[in-house]
Amino acid sequence: MKNTQLLNSVKHHIEAIYETVEGIDYRDLSIDLIDIMRLQQVDSGQPVRYVNHWDESDCLVISYGDSILQEGETPLHSLKHFLDKQVKGSINGVHILPFYPFTSDDGFSVLDYSSVNESLGDWRDIESIATDYKLMSDLVINHCSARSPWFENFVNGRDPGRNFFVTASPNDVLSAVVRPRTNPLLREVETADGTQHVWCTFSHDQVDLNFRNPDVLKQFASIIRQYLDSG
């Protein structure tokens, strides 16, 4: 590890995050995260503090991936064409709402974080937008689709996914949990490990991810790395 300052900084945060979780090697996990993010050769261990990368001159468009449609084009290509022809010079950034394959909630019940919904386009469309505009997107990290490969693996007792989701007992005292939903908080699921009750803050199609498992954190670090590589 070339940059011990970076390692120590990451380890400090990992210790705070996983203070109450037993059996975690803070140093090994920190090294894994640095490797996943490909930061091994970074010269400076600390980012410059309190640098605001946004100011009053920034103006952004927020859009679903299919808000702009043109016959014969993918929606994301049409979005780029609209930005270039209609608002370039007036705006310098675009926030695209979830553009992944999904099963419900307008894109917020994600099936596959590593893919672009093929009905919208592909990663080349995302990279094209990022070439000319500051690009922002949603990373839905609190839950994923109950039909995702991770949850299928949870049901079948396979990795990755077997221990990726928050579970609880129906005997737990949950009356203090307040949420604007009508469906029960817990969903009963038959799995290879027996009957389990998974935590569903939003809906039974959106199962909460368990970040007490460091493998979940590493999966999302890998996803973030992919997004950065794509603009």
Predicted regions and their residues:
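Active-site groove signature of glycoside hydrolases
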Residues: Y227-G231
